[in-house]
Amino acid sequence: MNHLTGLSRLSADSITGLLDTAAGFKQTLRSPNASFSPTLKNRRIALVFFENSTRTRFSFEIAARNLGAGTLGFSAASSSVSKGETLSDTIKNLEAMQVDAFVLRHPSSGSAKLISRITPKPVINAGDGSNEHPTQALLDMFTLREHFGSLKGLKVTIIGDVLHSRVARSNIYGLLRAGAEVGLCGPVTLIPPDAEKLGVRLFTDLDRAIAWADTAIVLRLQLERASGTYLPSLEEYSRHYGLTDERLERTGKHLLVLHPGPINREIEISNHVADRIQPPGYSKSMLLEQVTNGIAIRMAVLETLLGGTP
């Protein structure tokens, strides 16, 4: 594996290898005075983010530093991009500064793949438009595997704005390859028209989707995109597709709940469901555990792509 631009073509063995490597890092992270071998000492990793990020950017920075690498921050507004420099030229110039790897977030779908074709340095996709977000899916899969023991045969329902979600796409590819069953639930206007061709189940009724599933990944309703013809109103969306205690109690199902963040509270998920990490209740939130697991997964990705002698 030279790059990680998506999960659509990543083999099941490669996915398992990354999850296994992350498990080793997670075990060390649990230690009070966790320390790691500086396998990436003297490596420089450019965090090239053209969109805002909290969890992904900071966890990549922590992951890199845990392994001894240095990171270079990047802001499009304060770079030559604001003067018209292209993405390709930006990458080529950073490469000339002896950068060893690129972590790229960009609003254009396919941008990570494009960059991987013009540089021999590893490119890690931290989210490209509505295309993919592979490390988020890997940390979701890692979280589920840690809880259930295996992904094979696990029924995972992905709820909400699937149409615009790069997280959903990467999760669909990765979960299916790992042997899980995947269901998609949301308004017809927010489900990709070709979704069934991917081998997933489709639900428009959230109660039925919950009753079928072992766990749910709730997606952020992308308010900047999902408006107008996609949704009549936020109130109607929340009434039909918001995950609440009342809905879970009605189905009688105890559900493990994931969300990639950031959360639109009381729209796609209630405060109680988002914050409940202990019983009693009909759900258990894994949201903060996902954030913790993101460090281990991103360490595994960096180690896999860059480990060894420079």
Swiss-Prot record:
Gene3D superfamilies: Aspartate/ornithine carbamoyltransferase. InterPro entries: Asp/Orn_carbamoyltranf_P-bd, Asp/Orn_carbamoylTrfase, Asp/Orn_carbamoylTrfase_sf, Asp_carbamoyltransf, Asp_carbamoyltransf_Asp/Orn-bd. Signal peptide: none annotated. Pathway: Pyrimidine metabolism; UMP biosynthesis via de novo pathway; (S)-dihydroorotate from bicarbonate: step 2/3. Keywords: Pyrimidine biosynthesis, Transferase. Carbamoyl phosphate binds at residues 55-56, 105, 133, 136, 261-262. L-aspartate binds at residues 83, 166, 220. Transmembrane segments: none annotated. It comes from the Bacteria. GO terms for molecular function: amino acid binding; aspartate carbamoyltransferase activity. HAMAP family: Asp_carb_tr. Catalyzes the condensation of carbamoyl phosphate and aspartate to form carbamoyl aspartate and inorganic phosphate, the committed step in the de novo pyrimidine nucleotide biosynthesis pathway. Heterododecamer (2C3:3R2) of six catalytic PyrB chains organized as two trimers (C3), and six regulatory PyrI chains organized as three dimers (R2). This is Aspartate carbamoyltransferase catalytic subunit. It comes from Chlorobium phaeovibrioides (strain DSM 265 / 1930).
